[in-house]
Amino acid sequence: MEFPEHGVRLLGRLRQQRELGFLCDCTVLVGDARFPAHRAVLAACSVYFHLFYRDQPASSRDTVRLNGDIVTVPAFSRLLDFMYEGRLDLHSLPVEDVLAAASYLHMYDIVKVCKGRLRKKDPDLETRTLGTELPGQTPHPLPSWPPAFCQATPKAKPPSLGVKAVHPLPKFGPPSWQVSEESSGALDLSLKPGPRPEQAHPPCLLQTSQCSSIQQGAQPLVKAEQDSFSEQDSSSPQSADRSPPPVCASAARGLAVNLEPLHIQGTGSQQLGLHAEPVVDSEDLGPGRHLCICPLCCKLFPSTHALQPHLSAHFRERDSVRTRLSPEGAVPTCPLCSKTFSCTYTLKRHERTHSGEKPYTCVQCGKSFQYSHNLSRHAVVHTREKPHACRWCERRFTQSGDLYRHVRKFHYGLVKPLLV
């Protein structure tokens, strides 16, 4: 014999006990706020609390302190009410705060609901999150519960890499993250082969002589990055602390006059050359879209995905002369330190350590770099991208090193099991 109202009645009585402080056996601290609760309810609703009470000794289970930089007091209050009521109230509270708190506590049902709300609230969000995974990695969903807690949980199917639609759904799942700082590397702006979602329109760009005037007349809005590179990547004497604002759609409409359309040959992947100059339709930009500026030649692009192959073409054209072996067939050798190299290109790169040459210069702020990949990493500052996402709290960072330090500071307890 079943009693359908039993679950509702049980939750109601547990809620009354929490409000009265009756039989509450733990206290959750968020900043200066204290939340009395029942361990069994917390562990049943949150993987974070389940792992905490499973791994902590009995003497230290009475108090749980959450990271106040990630979990806000109002957001945790709503999540705690959800645990005892089965209803989630998102009114008068930013969905992003609830999403961050739910991700921190590993409440994946709430994470899914919040992401759905964000998709409905901002349909263009996928254009800003597409391609933000770390190089060489694909996103994969986290399990709803750890294997030790739910042995019979079926394995999640790997995400399909096929093309599903012209505008694919946004990939809100947290990207794979590697603990090693070296493996995370810089943002790779080179064109990668492999399956990619087709775009409704081919990537296109603007070329105009008014680019310099736009930069001179623009008001500074964004503070430039704090230089986290090594000494060999330090800025040249001519450096600016601010970058110009994004070009609005009306300006793009005026810049697109008298430009020739791009003629694309072939039916496979789209190829862009340095001199291909298609017209950017203002309707394609849409409201709130921003143009990206090439840091080498000041050309304008409708998105960072169109900028990537253009930057790659820059570096291929500049370095192609140096990739060949010497015509005499001799082994390339450094005349200063007598080191030998496999080709003249690596020798030229090595010679910069002696000469201090920095041939790659950002046209927006004047900062110079010895290597092209460092300029590519620096370009993210001007495009305002934050491609590196934390898999536990959904916070995003411009540089991979910032993500590494964030994880070491706030999520080290969750990372340690992955290192074993």
Swiss-Prot record:
InterPro entries: BTB/POZ_dom, SKP1/BTB/POZ_sf, Znf_C2H2_sf, Znf_C2H2_type. Residues 227-241 have a biased composition (Low complexity). CDD domains: BTB_POZ_ZBTB42. Residues 174-204, 216-248 are annotated as: Disordered. Its main location: cytoplasm. A zinc finger (C2H2-type) spans 292-314, 332-354, 360-382, 388-411. Residues 24-92 form the BTB domain. SMART domains: BTB (SM00225), ZnF_C2H2 (SM00355). GO terms for cellular component: cytoplasm; nucleoplasm; nucleus. One of its GO terms (molecular function) is DNA-binding transcription factor activity, RNA polymerase II-specific. It comes from the Eukaryota. Keywords: Cytoplasm, DNA-binding, Metal-binding, Nucleus, Repeat, Repressor, Transcription, Transcription regulation, Zinc, Zinc-finger. GO terms for biological process: muscle organ development; negative regulation of transcription by RNA polymerase II; regulation of transcription by RNA polymerase II. It is found in: Cytoplasm; Nucleus, Nucleoplasm. Transcriptional repressor. Specifically binds DNA and probably acts by recruiting chromatin remodeling multiprotein complexes. Belongs to the krueppel C2H2-type zinc-finger protein family. ZBTB18 subfamily. This is Zinc finger and BTB domain-containing protein 42.
